[in-house]
């Protein structure tokens, strides 16, 4: 049986001056007479003959090589392999062998040069919902000011840190977390191994979640105001930590001066057809503003308006640019529901405006990290390079949920085996370049989902498997605050509980696992920058290997009973002296002995 081996990393892809050397390994019987490298120049398909190499990379392994000219053409170099016999042909792509030529966007792809933020793939991100992470002392009186929350029809509720979260008035209940509280807890985050923070919205807004922006140019006084963000920026820089903000540009809040539903005298668009901001929103014939998904407090912004476009992203002091400049110097934006942003109350010309946001950000801060929020398929935006990455729900979170927690995003039952899970993950990332895969934003859960610990239910023993997976799969791992100490909770608002700072309320063994996995990732170039090959996926067991030059990291996930797994022969496993770095599995002569419900990591 013929087998082919290729990953878009060294030793298979190497740059030599103005050429990119592409190598394919073959093992097994019935080798082809010829191999052509299918590549493209300015979107035109080309076939380049590959040459069989005299030297073998390993005994029994044959290498074929060809070169791609880098002196011209687009930076994203897509390619696949056409194997030819005298009477037939087969194609080899990221998803294996096929009798059909691959779709253009499902080939191997590398970016040379890579214009994305070079720092992103090395990070350990930590997502913070500011009101629920840490409360600073002393506090300004303005931070605990009680006001009427129009969207909820009541005054906001202030609670003590240890009071339980309830379903009542979820968007109006405040626990007092703030940005100075985050600053005070940076030593804790440093101890965990965190290198970058992603904050849910911090700008002035009436709700606790702040997705109903009232002022894009000032931090909410409840969080400590502009000064607290400056202090946090300074403190994170002192520790070498990155800081990414949440940009809510699909809609504003209805209390924003631009809209002014509640008649505060700003001349907003809601009640004033002559308002200078009237065309920043869309209205039906009866004068009702078009909103986001039926939430009247979140009127949609209309990007048909040139003046709105200038205010949000195009202008020299636009909102997007403002927070990336000194003295703020933020490291990027997470773009809320970015796929829905557009014109005339909908998503018309969405791609044009998302590209404009990213272009403005990169002009201001070339290394800015732009992450789009997509619960669905984000590849359309990624393939068009209008985002650096997406929150990887579709390519990581949801298949992992299906395999370990047997549920989907609608919390409906979903039973999938290892083969289905890996086919799902591999199919999704096949549409992305290698560098894009490394920048995808991977999470087990977030402020918009139930906590993964809660989703597991009676299968709570599988939680460590997910943690190991998070730090070993291609992409940027992000911890949702509190996951590392065992915080649980169903969907909003229960997934937004205050952080349990009392040690007796923390799962210290889980915290230690997070620390170990973060340390492993930081030590391993293969985990941060390597390719990924699934070696085995059947029933309850997933085995994959990360590869970069001579570095190897082998990962085995077993959600079921103790078992033995015979790995298929692979040159990725040959001549490797393995050391077990996490877990208790054993590897002997290509046979894995895996304990029940376990995750094991080996490195060479």
Curated annotation (Swiss-Prot):
GO terms assigned for molecular function: alpha-1,4-glucosidase activity; protein homodimerization activity
Record bears the keyword Iron: no
Keyword Translocase (UniProt): no
Pfam families noted in UniProt: Alpha-amylase (PF00128), Alpha-amylase_N (PF02903)
Intracellular or extracellular location(s): Cytoplasm
InterPro entries attached to this UniProt entry: Glyco_hydro_13_cat_dom (IPR006047), Glyco_hydro_13_lg-like_dom (IPR004185), Glyco_hydro_b (IPR013780), Glycoside_hydrolase_SF (IPR017853), Ig_E-set (IPR014756), MalZ (IPR017069)
Induction statement: Under positive control of MalT.
Reactions performed catalytically: Hydrolysis of terminal, non-reducing (1->4)-linked alpha-D-glucose residues with release of alpha-D-glucose
TM region(s), chain numbering: none
UniProt-listed GO biological process terms: alpha-glucan catabolic process; maltose metabolic process
UniProt cross-references to SMART domains, sorted A to Z: Aamy
EC number: 3.2.1.20
Keyword annotations of the record: Cytoplasm, Glycosidase, Hydrolase, Maltose metabolism
GO CC terms: cytoplasm
Active-site residue list: 336 (nucleophile), 373 (proton donor)
Domain of life: Bacteria
Site description Transition state stabilizer, residues in chain: 448
Function: May play a role in regulating the intracellular level of maltotriose. Cleaves glucose from the reducing end of maltotriose and longer maltodextrins with a chain length of up to 7 glucose units.
Family the UniProt entry places it in: Belongs to the glycosyl hydrolase 13 family.
Listed PANTHER family: ALPHA-AMYLASE FAMILY MEMBER (PTHR10357), MALTODEXTRIN GLUCOSIDASE (PTHR10357:SF210)
Quaternary structure and partners: Monomer.
Protein name from the UniProt record: Maltodextrin glucosidase
Gene name per UniProt: malZ
């Amino acid at each position: 049986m013929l087998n082919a081996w290729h990953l878009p990393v060294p030793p298979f892809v190497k740059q030599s001056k103005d050429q990119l050397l592409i190598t394919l390994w073959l093992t097994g019987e019935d080798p082809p007479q010829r191999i052509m490298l299918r590549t493209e120049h300015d979107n035109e398909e080309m076939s380049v003959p590959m040459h069989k190499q005299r030297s073998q990379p390993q005994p029994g392994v044959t290498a074929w090589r060809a070169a791609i000219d880098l002196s011209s053409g687009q930076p994203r170099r897509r390619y696949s392999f056409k194997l030819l016999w005298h009477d037939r042909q087969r194609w080899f792509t990221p998803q294996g062998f096929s009798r059909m030529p691959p779709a253009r966007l499902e080939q191997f792809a590398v970016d040379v040069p890579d214009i994305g933020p070079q720092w992103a793939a090395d990070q350990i991100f930590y997502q913070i919902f500011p009101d629920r992470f840490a409360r600073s002392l002393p506090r300004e009186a303005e931070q605990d000011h009680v006001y009427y929350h129009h969207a909820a029809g009541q005054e906001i509720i202030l609670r003590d840190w240890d009071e339980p979260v309830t379903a009542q008035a979820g968007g109006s209940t405040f626990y007092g977390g703030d940005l100075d509280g985050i600053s005070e807890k940076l030593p804790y985050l440093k101890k965990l191994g965190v290198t970058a923070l992603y904050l849910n919205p911090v700008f002035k807004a009436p709700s606790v979640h702040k997705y109903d922006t009232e002022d894009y140019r000032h931090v909410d006084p409840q969080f400590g105001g502009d000064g607290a963000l400056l202090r946090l920026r300074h403190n994170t820089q002192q520790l070498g930590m990155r800081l990414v903000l949440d940009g809510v540009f699909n809609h504003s809040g209805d209390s924003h001066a631009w809209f002014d539903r509640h008649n505060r005298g700003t001349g907003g668009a809601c009640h004033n057809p002559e308002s200078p901001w009237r065309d920043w929103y869309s209205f039906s014939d009866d004068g009702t503003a078009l909103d986001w998904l039926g939430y009247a407090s979140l009127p949609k912004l209309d990007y048909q308006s040139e003046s709105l476009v200038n205010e949000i992203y195009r202008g020299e002091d636009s909102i997007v640019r403002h927070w990336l400049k000194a003295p703020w110097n933020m490291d990027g934006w997470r773009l809320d529901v970015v796929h829905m942003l557009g014109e005339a109350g909908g998503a018309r010309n969405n791609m044009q405006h998302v590209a404009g946001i990213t272009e403005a950000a990169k002009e201001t801060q070339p290394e800015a990290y732009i992450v789009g929020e997509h619960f669905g398929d984000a590849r359309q935006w990624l393939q068009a390079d209008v985002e650096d990455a997406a929150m990887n729900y579709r390519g990581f979170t949801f298949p992992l949920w299906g395999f370990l927690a047997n549920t989907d995003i609608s919390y409906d039952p979903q039973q999938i085996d290892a083969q289905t899970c890996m086919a799902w993950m591999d199919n999704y990332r096949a549409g992305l370049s290698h560098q894009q895969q490394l920048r995808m934003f991977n999470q087990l859960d977030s402020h918009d989902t139930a906590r993964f610990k809660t989703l597991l239910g009676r299968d709570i023993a599988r939680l460590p498997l997910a943690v190991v997976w998070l730090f070993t799969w291609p992409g940027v791992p992000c911890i949702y605050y509190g996951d590392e100490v065992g915080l649980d909770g169903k969907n909003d608002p229960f997934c937004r509980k205050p952080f349990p700072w009392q040690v007796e309320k923390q799962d210290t063994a889980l915290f230690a696992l997070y620390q170990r996995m973060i340390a492993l990732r930081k030590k391993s170039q293969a985990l941060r920058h390597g390719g990924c090959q699934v070696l085995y996926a059947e029933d309850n067991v997933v085995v994959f290997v990360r590869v970069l030059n001579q570095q190897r990291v082998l990962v085995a996930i077993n959600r079921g009973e103790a078992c033995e797994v015979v790995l298929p022969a692979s040159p990725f496993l040959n001549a490797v002296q393995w050391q077990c770095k996490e877990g208790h599995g054993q590897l002997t002569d290509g046979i894995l002995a895996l304990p029940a419900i376990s995750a094991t990591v080996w490195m060479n």
